[in-house]
Amino acid sequence: MYGIEYTTVLTFLISIILLNYILKSLTRIMDCIIYRLLFIIVILSPFLRAQNYGINLPITGSMDTAYANSTQEETFLTSTLCLYYPTEAATEINDNSWKDTLSQLFLTKGWPTGSVYFKEYTNIASFSVDPQLYCDYNVVLMKYDATLQLDMSELADLILNEWLCNPMDITLYYYQQTDEANKWISMGSSCTIKVCPLNTQTLGIGCLTTDATTFEEVATAEKLVITDVVDGVNHKLDVTTATCTIRNCKKLGPRENVAVIQVGGSDILDITADPTTAPQTERMMRINWKKWWQVFYTVVDYVDQIIQVMSKRSRSLNSAAFYYRV
């Protein structure tokens, strides 16, 4: 009886010793594998060229700041370029492979295939409502049209700057502009804007608040209007709301990843006279009107100089962001 108990105890002790030996062996093997892996990583890390995300980036500040690529100095290998052009350009060229041709030409300037996107827009009105400025760098080609000169200059002001916008209910409220950076931006197929300035008793100054025909007309049947009135004065507005939307906007500063190239025209569009445009923009350029092939060749040839006056941005814009933070 006692012999059986001694045997059981001895077997139990041997099992514990054997299990302990196995666990220690496994631990030594795992330690060896981990240490060797870490040693290999340490040896190879100086030879690796990989994008480093998240390190040395501040967690505060503007998301508009352009952060440099710490491991890659070649700008074009890590960036995207969007080239916006009117429908008539593709119609005139009439070549199914013209984009492939331009992509190969951009490749000679350091832009890899697939990094340049060609974006077509129908007209200024549709483009202003839904710009979709998604790329790191965005270059907009606008053919000069004397009948749309004002719309073109205002579109340039719109996309070359950032705006913080809110909806306006002109049927219920009076509105005033607080400073020079505060504007009212209207968009639509036909925008006619009338204003009636009010005194401290909310009576019209030179107009009747109950009669829109006495209001001062500041825009007539335009597709895009940036309205500027006397600061600090309440205004009652009359807008063709059936074909136009109006928003109360604040200019925040330049949108430096966008450039506008005017194509042709005897007059040069210029928004630098606006006192809120500071510093004077260099991102608005002009190409003499030629065939569209010649225009695109010129853009390819001078793309490096164009990009040099721009700054890469970390945020893309769609139509929703455009309305509330343009």
Swiss-Prot record:
Annotated segments matching region LVD motif: 237-239
One example GO MF annotation: metal ion binding
Protein name, as recorded: Outer capsid glycoprotein VP7
Protein's job: Calcium-binding protein that interacts with rotavirus cell receptors once the initial attachment by VP4 has been achieved. Rotavirus attachment and entry into the host cell probably involves multiple sequential contacts between the outer capsid proteins VP4 and VP7, and the cell receptors. Following entry into the host cell, low intracellular or intravesicular Ca(2+) concentration probably causes the calcium-stabilized VP7 trimers to dissociate from the virion. This step is probably necessary for the membrane-disrupting entry step and the release of VP4, which is locked onto the virion by VP7.
Keyword Iron: no
Residues glycosylated per entry: N69
Family statement drawn from the similarity comment of this UniProt entry: Belongs to the rotavirus VP7 family.
Gene3D superfamilies documented for this protein: Glycoprotein VP7, domain 1 (3.40.50.11130), Rotavirus outer-layer protein VP7, domain 2 (2.60.120.800)
Subunit and partners: Homotrimer; disulfide-linked. 2 Ca(2+) ions bound at each subunit interface in the trimer hold the trimer together. Interacts with the intermediate capsid protein VP6. Interacts with the outer capsid protein VP5*. Interacts with host integrin heterodimer ITGAX/ITGB2. Interacts with host integrin heterodimer ITGA5/ITGB3.
Keywords for this protein: Calcium, Capsid protein, Disulfide bond, Glycoprotein, Host endoplasmic reticulum, Host-virus interaction, Metal-binding, Outer capsid protein, Signal, T=13 icosahedral capsid protein, Virion
Disulfide bond annotation, renumbered to this chain: C82-C135, C165-C249, C191-C244, C196-C207
